[in-house]
Amino acid sequence: MATWMLAGHILMGSAQLAAYVYRLIRPHKIGIFGPSLAGKTTLDQYLTVPGDIDPIPVEMRTTHPVKNGSFQIPHATKKQVRWKGEKTPIMTADIGGQSQYWNLWAEDMIDRNTSVVFFVVDDRVAWSQPAMQEAVAGFKYLTDIIVNHRFPSTFSRSMKKKAKKYKPKVVCLVLNKMDLWWTNESQQMWDMGLRRQHPMVTPFQEDMRRLRKSAVATNVEATAAQYGLNVEGAVIRTINMI
């Protein structure tokens, strides 16, 4: 009996090692998008090296150089998310949130064939009408690409071909900066499984339903990327929905 148990443990350990090596070679491809100043760069920095992140000044927000009349997309980089004793390799890129960069969201998402999309918003969607409208418009833009294949007209023939076949496995709405908006009511809603009914989620519900009807799973997570609050858990729980 002991021999069989030992053999079982060895096989399980070998399977876990094989899965980890596979992910080292082929990490989860994740897209991180959302409006400007919502915390995407902070999230990318935290995933690169965990720890408290210095606030990023407005004048230092992410921008992209222009070449031949087009904004240049940055290269995605490998990272490892450590959670509950396990390491999960991922690849992400830091892309600006201004509307002139939305085509880069589409390019990154489709060209890398990302299986998970994180759309990051912050507390401004709760108290600023312009910020909420901008965030909803950005989320709708991505949803239209995924559901209706409304890709940018600037796409090359090969990219258009990829776009017609592209569909992520999961789209997660990340409510960032929870250190600014989280309340006892928020905690109660999370505890009761009602996070999708939170007022910050309400403006995005219609497009989340559109994604679900197109066989794309959706998730809602709360984080404070600047302080690393719930970041690893949010990423891994979403990946596990694949």
Per-range role (PLM):
Residues I95-W102:
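Short acidic, Gly/Ser-rich segments with clustered Asp/Glu that frequently serve as metal-coordination loops
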Residues G39-K40, W181, E221-I242:
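Conserved GTPase G-domain signal focused on the G5
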Residues G31-I32, T92-D94, V170-K177, V220-A225, ...:
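Extended hydrophobic secondary-structure segments that form protein cores and membrane-embedded regions
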